[in-house]
Amino acid sequence: MFSSTLARRTAALVQSTGIAKRAFAMGPSSGGAVSDETLEKLGSLSTQALVDGLWVMGWPAAQIDGARPLAPGMKCVGRAVTLNFVPARPDIAQDKPAGGESPEYEAFEKCGPNEVLVMSSTGPWESVGGDIKFLRLKQLSIGGLVTDGSVRDTDEIINYGFPCFSYSTTARQGPAAMQPWECNGIVSLSGTVVRPGDAIIGDQDGVVCVPAKVAEMVYSIAHGREEIEEIVKEELIKNPGPPGKYYPFMSGKVKVDSPLGQLLATKGITPENSNQFEGTADW
């Protein structure tokens, strides 16, 4: 009697307050998709330069902390295809599409050479997969895999040849601890938000997510900064001295008459062709 009465009252409350209409209200998962041309440009830069570019724009943390290359020399560049894991629970295991219809295999099939599979784990030591599952990623020539969790069968995955970045490695299976639940939703890895279509770039220093909506501007800033840093480094090798004469600098605020501004002028970099000077910022 109590449960049926409570159910009726709850239903009435839902209808009267409009909760039913708002329950699934949300914004779009994707903010767009980075073009192949932009991916190539972003991939030509270091992750440090990209992080600096986002920092200059005032955007929040972009590095996926803890995601490290499984082997030296690995580098990944691609559009994010996301997969979210949730803690294991009997009803979730029952309700999740089974077999080949599972969200994880849906995500796999969306991947190719210009995509990076981004897998959000429930913990750094939980396994998101191993050699049998990831054989399919090898067959698809995936651009890379990134997770804030762990992977197993490390040697086999390295031999598959695709770039893999994870928090750690493990011998444990994952299904006992978590279940794949959603493909191409917004995910969070180590506190960094990733949307489907964002640019994912990984190298020896870590993995960075560049939001699709600002990818071109981030490239413009980061490329300009990296160019200046190379000039500064070259000058300090040629004329040894404290780096503080030229470095650090703030993009969009370099003064023409400063030591750095004068050095850049000798290399043909001026406010007319660079957005790094005072008054030239276009972001």
Predicted regions, residues:
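Beta-strand-loop-alpha-helix segment that lines the small-molecule cofactor/substrate pocket
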Residues: 203
